[in-house]
């Protein structure tokens, strides 16, 4: 099924300049589909989206990273077809306003590379709505066990949509959505009590449900417990789903876990605690812990291994009530995976983190040739300079350009081989932004607000060396939230702000540039016609100056006061991002996309390895928006061609 058949969105700006009906040779060969690059990325379709708007039909599509050519950009253009007839050749963008289009029109796109027309994208029907609606199968309500296992006992619960991620589960070039269902009695790590089971669903964009995984009674529900990854880790063209599991987990076919250690463990035991530590009723403090790989098309178990890092002594994580033991993070990443030294194949690995803020650990795993194997482990114990330097999220970035990504874990950068690289020593934090925040400066930067009252409330530092570029004052109040990106054309590079920064600062200089602004401190999204990024908060998208661009009054946000979306990412259409919100009542997801015409032409952000890996981690911990490896903003340079390959 072609992606564009199901897509829809809203509002329109001005038209886009094009060359009409440029003569080309007929299709005689396909472009080299990126078979020789370094980083293994997804083989996507054109992602054509057609939307009825005032003045015609908006059409958007992908340019792939491997066909993007910054040296000779005129080498590629796109022929746009309506109802099988070519209507335009577009050379300066990847979107178009068809003023003669109607709600009955269908569209397809063919790239033209070096004068040769490539294969057809397949037809995309025109949609009238402002969004794509995906109906959901709401799980049935449940009741927790009685005393003494659960306190409060026999607690009823229903389910809410929570965080989501995407991957091409069935190899058709279209993203599927993997969605977490949380029971309404989900708990924070410092709250006792039993919870309902956590569920993972997979949906195609046409609303077809592929499968449901039930993580079982021994996986507690809450924002810090279940961090799942969706990516093609073995390069077979189908994405896998990887998540922490336990006895009681049932895969997408309804079968109990039965490979690796799960084959010999009793899968029927309920390990929930009866408060053998203070305030830990309902916690899972004993019993097996697994890491499981599930097949994308079916949700069937492919492999299960013992989870590493293991819990060990619940009191060995820096607290006395087992809360920090069960702080988890996860991301896909292109790390050093070929043995000793910083050698990287360019194939993705699985990274699972446990602990924080006192003791944190990260383990890297490979899923290759039907084998799940651990390749390295990093531990920041209390006696090391990396202790207490993490965050409630982590981000992947190749900070030294060697073809392997490092892990930015709060104030620390961890080498791609699992050794420490550098740290600012400024301590723990809840938010984290990693990208080219200062385009006039070589390399990548990190912006982070801090929760330690002994250090600066925020800092901007070099991602490779941890050299501090700018920092805030030391205050008695800590900064819990913060955002950094190029959201205004008035200042060079990224702007940044926190809950107590006193306004908006320049990431480049550290100077306060706007003391009156009060922008939201949540998510970011590339939305309208310009290069500045917009703000996403709750169920709305706004400009930096507060101008409302999109909202969904019928939708709800996730994670309480965090008010986060299900997901933001470049899911289809041109390089700009989509936002997934859940409808109030959880009956459906809505995927909103922009229909503002832009003349900025970029390849799909999902073919930027840094952005794609950060999307994989977006749903973990304290959700953070993804950042590309290059600067997007007023006066930006064309980014380099990504060194990627696809199946």
Language model segments and positions:
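Short, ordered beta-strand-loop transition motifs
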Residues: 51-55, 90, 344
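Bacterial N-terminal signal peptides
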Residues: 2-14
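Recognizes extended acidic, P/S/T-rich segments that occur
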Residues: 60-104
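Long terminal accessory regions outside catalytic cores
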Residues: 50, 59-60, 109
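Beta-propeller-forming repeat regions
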Residues: 34-43, 68, 91, 97-647
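Bacterial Sec-dependent N-terminal signal peptides
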Residues: 15-34
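Structural beta-strand segments of beta-rich domains
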Residues: 46, 55-59
């Amino acid at each position: 099924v072609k992606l564009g058949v199901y897509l829809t969105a809203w509002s329109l700006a001005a038209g886009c300049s094009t060359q009409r009906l440029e003569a080309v040779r007929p299709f005689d060969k396909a472009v080299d589909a990126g078979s020789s690059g370094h980083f293994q990325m997804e083989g996507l379709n054109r992602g054509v989206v057609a939307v009825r708007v005032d003045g015609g039909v908006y059409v958007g599509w992908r340019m792939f990273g491997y066909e993007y050519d910054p040296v000779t950009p005129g080498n590629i253009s796109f022929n746009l077809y309506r109802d099988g007839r070519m209507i335009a050749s577009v050379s300066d963008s990847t979107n178009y306003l068809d003023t003669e289009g109607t709600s009955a029109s269908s569209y397809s796109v063919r790239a033209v590379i070096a004068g040769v027309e490539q294969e057809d994208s397949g037809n995309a029907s025109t949609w009238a709505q402002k969004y794509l609606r995906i109906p959901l199968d709401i799980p049935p309500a449940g009741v927790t066990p009685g005393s003494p296992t659960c306190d409060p006992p026999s607690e009823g619960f229903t389910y809410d949509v929570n965080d989501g991620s995407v991957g091409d589960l069935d190899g058709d070039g279209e993203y599927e959505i993997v969605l977490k269902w949380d029971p309404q009695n989900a708990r924070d790590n410092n709250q006792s009590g039993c919870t309902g089971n956590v569920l993972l669903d997979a949906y195609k964009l046409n609303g077809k449900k592929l499968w449901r995984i039930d993580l079982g009674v021994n996986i507690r529900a809450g924002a810090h417990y279940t961090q799942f990854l969706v990516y093609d880790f073995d390069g077979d063209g189908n994405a896998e789903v990887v998540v922490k599991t336990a006895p009681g987990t049932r895969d997408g076919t309804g079968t109990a876990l039965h490979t690796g250690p799960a084959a010999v463990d009793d899968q029927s035991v309920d390990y929930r605690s009866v408060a053998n530590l203070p305030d830990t009723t309902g916690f899972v403090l004993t019993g097996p812990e697994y890491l499981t790989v599930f097949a994308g098309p079916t949700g069937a178990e492919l492999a299960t291994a013992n989870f590493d890092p293991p819990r060990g002594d619940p009191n060995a994580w820096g607290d006395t009530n087992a809360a920090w033991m069960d702080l988890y993070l996860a991301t896909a990443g292109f790390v050093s995976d070929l043995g000793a030294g910083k050698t990287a194949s360019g194939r993705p690995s699985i990274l699972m983190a446990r602990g924080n803020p006192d003791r944190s650990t990260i383990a890297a795993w490979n899923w290759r040739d039907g084998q799940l194997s651990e390749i390295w482990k990093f531990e920041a114990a209390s006696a090391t300079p990396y202790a207490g330097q993490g965050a409630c999220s982590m981000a992947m970035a190749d900070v030294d350009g060697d073809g392997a990504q490092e892990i930015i874990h709060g104030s620390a950068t961890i080498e791609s081989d699992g050794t420490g690289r550098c740290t600012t020593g400024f301590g723990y934090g809840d938010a984290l932004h990693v990208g080219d925040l200062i385009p006039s400066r070589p390399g990548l930067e990190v912006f982070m607000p801090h929760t330690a009252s002994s250090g600066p409330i925020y800092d901007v530092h070099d991602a490779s060396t941890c050299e501090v570029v700018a920092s805030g004052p030391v205050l008695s109040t800590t900064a819990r939230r913060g955002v950094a990106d190029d959201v205004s054309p008035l200042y060079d590079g990224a702007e940044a702000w926190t809950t107590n920064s006193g306004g908006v600062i320049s990431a480049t200089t550290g100077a306060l540039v706007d003391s009156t602004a009060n922008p939201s401190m949540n998510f970011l999204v590339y939305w309208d016609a310009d290069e500045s990024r917009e703000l996403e908060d709750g169920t709305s998208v706004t400009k930096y100056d507060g101008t409302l661009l999109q909202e969904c009054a019928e939708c709800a946000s996730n994670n309480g006061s965090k008010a986060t979306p299900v997901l933001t990412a470049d899911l289809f259409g041109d390089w700009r991002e989509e936002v997934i919100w859940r409808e109030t009542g959880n009956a459906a997801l809505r995927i909103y996309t922009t229909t503002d015409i832009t003349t900025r032409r970029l390849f799909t952000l999902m073919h930027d390895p840094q952005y794609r890996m950060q999307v994989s981690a977006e749903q973990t911990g304290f959700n953070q928006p993804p950042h590309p490896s290059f600067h997007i903003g007023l006066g930006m340079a064309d980014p380099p061609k990504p060194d990627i390959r696809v199946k």
